[in-house]
Amino acid sequence: MDAPKPWHLYLLLCRNGSYYAGITNDLERRFQAHLHGTGARYTRANPPVQVLASHRYPDRASASRAECALKRQPRARKLAWLQAQSSDTESHSADASITHI
């Protein structure tokens, strides 16, 4: 039996300069959904430019709790979270290239 896939809390940079936080168990698939307008309503109106950071969680419940906590934070705290994650995160840009931030 396969082990359950981990869940990811991710932070997107949107074209208008805003951030969008979400969770998924397949980060690449979810980012592509956001890019193609089949993701969240917010990213249909404010298309993403890149995944700024992500953090892995063992299950959906813990990822959801972390997402709620991150969404309640002001922009400055989201930036601090981003900086804390940046050392071990891959960044996915809209042109599908992968770079480290």
Swiss-Prot record:
Where is the segment annotated Disordered? 81-101
User: In terms of domain of life, where is this protein from?
Assistant: Bacteria
Q: Which Pfam families match?
A: GIY-YIG
Entry-linked Gene3D superfamilies: GIY-YIG endonuclease
Biased composition, Polar residues: where in the chain? 83-101
Annotated SUPFAM superfamilies:
GIY-YIG endonuclease
Task: Please list the residue ranges annotated as the GIY-YIG domain.
Answer: 5-80
PROSITE patterns xrefs = GIY_YIG
Q: Which family, according to the similarity comment?
A: Belongs to the UPF0213 family.
Q: State the name under which the record lists this protein.
A: UPF0213 protein XOO1228
Give the organism, scientific name: Xanthomonas oryzae pv. oryzae (strain MAFF 311018)
